Amino acid sequence: MKIATYNVNGIRSRLPNLLEWLEREAPDIACLQELKAADQGFPIGAINDAGYGALWAGQASWNGVAILAKGVDPVESRRGLPGDAKDTQSRYLEAMAHGVLIGCLYLPNGNPWPGPKFDYKLAWFERFLRHAQRLLDTGQPVVLAGDYNVVPTDEDIYDPKHWRRDALLQPESRDAYARLLAQGWTDALRERHPDERIYTFWDYFRQHWPRDRGLRIDHLLLAPALAGKLKDANVDRWVRDRPKASDHAPVWIELAAGAGRRSPAKKSVAKKAPAKKAPARKAVKAPAEKRSARKPAKSTPGRRLS
């Protein structure tokens, strides 16, 4: 079974690249982040035509997550993290597909640091930690996949000294990620590549992709029920080299056959609207996360302010 995560950085503008990747790599499950489209703007027709069922939580211009499943319709179990009823940002979606419980997340970026966006990042991370522990306690085969916006160690970035004031490298961000692993989750990519500098994101700024000046911020974490079934993990770098590419490349894992439990997912892959949402609430106080503009401040080379 192949499970992937891919920050598309705008699903409408990257749709050709997404469809090419789905056809060529054929993941059984794909988690998408930064859709940057309202629910009605999600290209479900094209996704269905590619052979995938989908659930999505959109948001106009910002955020947005989706779970795609090959040949089946994923069964939603949660939309949004518990713990803050006022937070309406579309950052977390959870569903069962092919016998595996998938948590798809887009963790807040947190820049500029320090400030309210970083405070929101840490608060969101704490809620995520609590929910992750509850998932572990169930003993289910769970994968938490997405853009974590955390560079776990200095080995996960081309040159940490230029990013010391970025939210992705702050001690609080790294500590939260370390506490997540301490719960019992396995960082799949690092498990398969313990000593390799392997990246998942290359900024558009200053030719970072041609120079391979990357960061590892997209992660797939495995519950103990799946950790022993990990066969391989890697990054589809070729996608980052396509015209009009996202600044992220897809990251994937391969699990041994029989890794998942019997799934209740239906084999229809029918075109459908996203699952019903709660009535609209007042705008969340949390600051919006903008990641389209990547140019750093002059005083801090390489720093993303979004």
For the regions a protein language model found, what residue spans apply to each?
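Active-site environment of divalent metal-dependent phosphoester hydrolases
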Residues: I11-S13, A37-Q40, W113, V151-P152, ...
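Metal-dependent phosphoester-hydrolase catalytic domains
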Residues: R24, D39-G41, S77-D84, T153-K271, ...
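Surface-exposed cleft-lining segments at the edges of enzyme active sites
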Residues: P82-G83, P108-F125, K161-D166
